[in-house]
Amino acid sequence: MEKQSSRRGLLKNAAKAAVAVTGGAVLASTAKAQAPATLEKKSYPAKPRTDPSAAPPLFSSAVSYGNLVFLAGVGYHESGTIEEATKHVLDELEKNLQSAGSSMEKVLKVNVYLNDIKDWARMNTAYAGRWGQVPPVRTTIAPAGGIPGNSLVEIDLIAYI
């Protein structure tokens, strides 16, 4: 009797595994069928090249791929408060999003880099309310070496178009 029940258990497990594999194959083929035939990567240079002999830019200020847009970090390299710096950075990001055909309401992910983590609460006062009804997910860090260009804050993001 024990051999028979262990065989039944083995057969049940094999049947479950077959269903799982078949279901996975169906899902994979469905996803493949729904994927666009070609996705085009579009880059928006950080600074337009006026001199063709000049070296190419190190990075793009924005890159879109499919219906996603990735914005490079924007900082504020002037003197001022963290609130002023954050407002300026968010205003610049909003302009960049609009140029790419998106908006602050369509932002999915934000990375905030603070020169000093003690500015976190004050940065949040300028940050709040800029994203529509559903704010994006966010990570905030204070890099040990600070932010290049002595900015109080730098923000990059990912949005959809």
Where are the language model's segments positioned?
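Phosphate/pyrophosphate-binding loops at sites that engage ATP/ADP/AMP, CoA/4′-phosphopantetheine
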Residues: 97-105
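N-terminal presequence-like segments and the immediate start of the first folded domain
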Residues: 2-87, 115-161
